[in-house]
Amino acid sequence: MKSRKKRLREVYVWELPVRIYHWVNALCIVILCVTGFIIADPPAIMSASEAYFSYWFGVVRFIHFVTAFVFFFNFVFRLYWGFVGNRYARWNNFIPLKKSQWKEVLEVIKVDILMIKNKPVDSIGHNALASLIYFGTFWAFLLQSITGFGLYAKMSQSFFPQLFAWTVPLMGGDLMARQIHHFLMWFFILF
């Protein structure tokens, strides 16, 4: 039997803006989770020093809010890049509109999750199931931002958070908005 060499070619999949988005997003999620835990359940730290020097909780909140803005505008940039990036970054790659994409979703489930097939699904970039899951994750990013800015709107008179003030009553109040915000944090941690 004669062995055949596979012809390989290099494909540039993950453009620099996508890589930057990914790592900025990862750093933001870590910072937001840590500061979010502290905001949700602040430790009781007693200090004999002047109050000016022990304004640590205000600093934690400030870091959380600034990072939230970075997270949101990084997400807005990724939305934009989904229209102008290469074919692997575009939205039509993430939204399975074609029959072939749905077929690949089922094939990946059979191979990687159910393990009833042995032949791996070859894909350049994300396979169709991963793309679909990332599309859902983008919606989770949006909902996380909406709930966060909606909760922040009550404490801020700034223009931008006020754009989201309508979301908290729509969700049934502060408690439900906070619960959704908290649940999505755990989704990102586990994802």
Describe each region flagged by the PLM.
Residues M1-F191:
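Membrane-embedded alpha-helical bundles that constitute the cytochrome b-like, heme-associated redox core
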